[in-house]
Amino acid sequence: MSDLTHLDETGKARMVDVGAKDETLREAVVRGEVHMRPETLQRLAAGDMPKGDALATARIAGIMAAKRAPDLIPLCHPLLLTHVAVDVRLDAATSTVQIEATVRTVGKTGVEMEALTAVSVAALTVYDMCKAIDRTMQIGAIRLVRKSGGRSGEIVCE
């Protein structure tokens, strides 16, 4: 269990002490998608949704969610985020809403959880705003694409 930093010597969950770590520029990029019927995607593109501008709302929801990650995820460190961007685009070929979040900070721990939270909540927001016309939607493929900073250096997952 020694390689699991969120567990103490007895196996109990704990918040990792990052006090001795150096402050470095940290960045994480996460992607995810919402699959939907082509008709739903067309209505999104046309801005014809019963609840309003779903894509703009999803972007803002994702940004807000990144800032609230420590309130949602136990033992997640509160961080001073220096940048949060959420990009939401439509892919007609796959009938998906593609979501990408980039989060940065200068700090002692990474920002993957904040980026994962941003994409997750943006996807949930798209779902919520489209569910009245499409109950077949699926949220999926939420994954870390890249992270950098700290002892691990750069990690590229795709």
Curated annotation (Swiss-Prot):
GO terms for molecular function: cyclic pyranopterin monophosphate synthase activity. Substrate binds at residues 75-77, 113-114. The keyword Lyase applies. It holds the Pfam family MoaC. InterPro entries: MoaC, MoaC_bact/euk, MoaC_sf, MoCo_biosynth_MoaA/MoaC, Mopterin_CF_biosynth-C_dom. It comes from the Bacteria. The active site is at residue 128. Coiled coil: none annotated. Its EC number is 4.6.1.17. It catalyses: (8S)-3',8-cyclo-7,8-dihydroguanosine 5'-triphosphate = cyclic pyranopterin phosphate + diphosphate. Gene3D superfamilies: Molybdopterin cofactor biosynthesis C (MoaC) domain. GO terms for biological process: Mo-molybdopterin cofactor biosynthetic process. Pathway: Cofactor biosynthesis; molybdopterin biosynthesis. Keywords: Lyase, Molybdenum cofactor biosynthesis. HAMAP family: MoaC_B (MF_01224_B). Catalyzes the conversion of (8S)-3',8-cyclo-7,8-dihydroguanosine 5'-triphosphate to cyclic pyranopterin monophosphate (cPMP). Belongs to the MoaC family. Homohexamer; trimer of dimers. This is Cyclic pyranopterin monophosphate synthase. It comes from Roseiflexus castenholzii (strain DSM 13941 / HLO8).
